[in-house]
């Protein structure tokens, strides 16, 4: 699929231009984080083969790991059955979480 065909498959309207994106370790299957993408961040992710997200708090694009060096190299991108959520499998360099943990899901509630 080319970029335009990929973008047609995704329903950005439901989330007011944003879609939740689950980041999973390609090798272990561990869920590393959840972030949000808009069309531009998805385009940049596909173009650069590293993850780009939309920061809802800063209202800007950010390239995961650009500052810390903890980059995420894209191995595959999947879409859910409703076309409104992405799953991106990555090769994670260093920790995925800004706290220094491998995954953002390090706190157990139950």
UniProtKB/Swiss-Prot annotation:
It is found in: Cytoplasm. Binds 1 Mg(2+) ion per subunit. InterPro entries: PRA-CH, PRib_AMP_CycHydrolase_dom, PRib_AMP_CycHydrolase_sf. GO terms for molecular function: magnesium ion binding; phosphoribosyl-AMP cyclohydrolase activity; zinc ion binding. Its main location: cytoplasm. Keywords: Amino-acid biosynthesis, Cytoplasm, Histidine biosynthesis, Hydrolase, Magnesium, Metal-binding, Zinc. Its cofactor is Mg(2+); Zn(2+). GO terms for biological process: L-histidine biosynthetic process. It catalyses: 1-(5-phospho-beta-D-ribosyl)-5'-AMP + H2O = 1-(5-phospho-beta-D-ribosyl)-5-[(5-phospho-beta-D-ribosylamino)methylideneamino]imidazole-4-carboxamide. Signal peptide: none annotated. It comes from the Bacteria. Catalyzes the hydrolysis of the adenine ring of phosphoribosyl-AMP. This is Phosphoribosyl-AMP cyclohydrolase. It comes from Clostridium botulinum (strain 657 / Type Ba4).
């Amino acid at each position: 699929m080319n970029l335009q065909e990929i973008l047609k498959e995704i329903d950005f309207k439901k989330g007011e231009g944003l879609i939740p994106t689950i980041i999973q370790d390609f090798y272990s299957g561990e869920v590393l984080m959840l972030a949000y993408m808009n069309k531009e961040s998805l385009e940049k992710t596909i173009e650069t083969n590293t993850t780009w997200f939309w920061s809802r708090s800063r209202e800007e694009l950010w390239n995961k790991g650009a500052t810390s060096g903890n980059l995420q190299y894209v191995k595959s991108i999947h879409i859910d059955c409703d076309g409104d959520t992405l799953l991106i499998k990555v090769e994670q360099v260093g920790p995925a979480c800004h706290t220094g943990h491998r995954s953002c899901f390090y706190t157990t509630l139950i």
